[in-house]
């Protein structure tokens, strides 16, 4: 292919990347950035001809080849075929794409990927990007290093994550001491964090992605821009608060995109996001307030097994076009950067720096127009006669909102028992949600330690408890019937809400069954792998309450009908177990329903 035959080179490069992805994944367990994510990030960073781009955690070269393809298309669109101008511009971009990767084999693969994409492989180098700059490859030091005119204008990267595993954390003191984030931070009374510079305050370990974030922002030239994949928990977990504050005080956060949970499947289920950040120019003052682009990706073109998901036509047949929304997000970001008006939607919108919630929360979900509309609907009750808005934790003086203990029952769990008469049934969150008890686990209490027996007592529920799923798919509500309370242990993955007043209980059942309540719970979910809720989120959740229960009589009646239906279904399930067909066949009724 000719050097400027973009389609041919793109096809060869894509084929090679797919081949190496499959083979490396099998051999080394490497995690690769979804090509759709690469393309979106490159579009949103929008490199110009002559700008230097870098991936400091380069892997097999996905971002480098993506940058090169994007720049080559720009050259072709802005020059005539076979012209000296085109040749000159193609030569410029060939020398403008850089990569640093610690694994020697991956550097070789990245070079091959660049050759298959149409050259530009000279910038692919081996090194540890967390080392001091003077230890980098001389090629990088001369052509793409901090503090020089040749410093990178753009960094696009997906750094290694620790996943909070000790063996994946950075513990090298010689590295940690050179990073702000390698030191402890202290918070003053005003909530401002200060990072120590003392050697006595060097952390024992730090997550590599945190160090990469700092290194990337230090590396790019003033006025440069960064696109970096990070764990989703970075956006709102309190443990990352000091890093978010530092980021927002020293740089401009242009945008945040949360990625679909299947983005890196089947390699890993870690939930991820992308930060788009600009480094102020020298003497540039960061505005006190500005708009931040936010998006929540809902479609990624594949399922949890990595199988492609295509758009279907009107007849239900595949169009061959991947079903994803990353191009839509990139289009909206382009309009945002160009100052063009863009209609806010449920999943793509803007928010202001000053409007950010406590703890420098930058998770788009917390600012979703749809979810916040539900919050505003609840707050409106403060303006209605005979109504007020309060928190669920303040509804009753002796209200209890809690979850059971985390425990390990593997040594006392019995799989597929033939006799369950001396065993204790245990319900997972999904099992508790079932109207009939299909998914019962069985526990042998005679094998339990004294500590496990204490935990078993704590996992019992009381009749009338309202339970909310708090992990994975959060916000689903169920009710503790008499049978459940008398006979079952229930997973700690359900938050328990216990109230004494019957009207209040029915009212809460109806409230938690509503879309409004679900939206409020989704506003508070958090997590890097699975989404979670804590009892405190339920305690602090807003709810409208009337001065007199007669004002909510219809809602209370609806809640009571739900409770009555749950009890009736529970009794019917017990009856059919005891007197159904299994009884006629003289088979043990409980075990016939087991799906361990």
Where are these regions (language model features)?
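Long recognition/docking surfaces used for binding and targeting
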Residues: 1-21
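Conserved S-adenosyl-L-methionine
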Residues: 30-157, 162-166, 173, 230-233, ...
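Conserved Class I SAM-dependent methyltransferase catalytic core
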Residues: 192-263, 268-270, 274-277
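Flexible, glycine-/basic-rich loop-and-beta segments that form/coincide
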Residues: 265-380, 386
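A short glycine-rich beta-alpha junction/loop motif
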Residues: 275, 487-495, 526-553
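Non-catalytic DNA-recognition/assembly elements of restriction-modification systems
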Residues: 333-413, 547-596
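Sequence-specific dsDNA recognition surfaces
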Residues: 393-414, 430-463
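A short beta-sheet element
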Residues: 457-459, 466-513
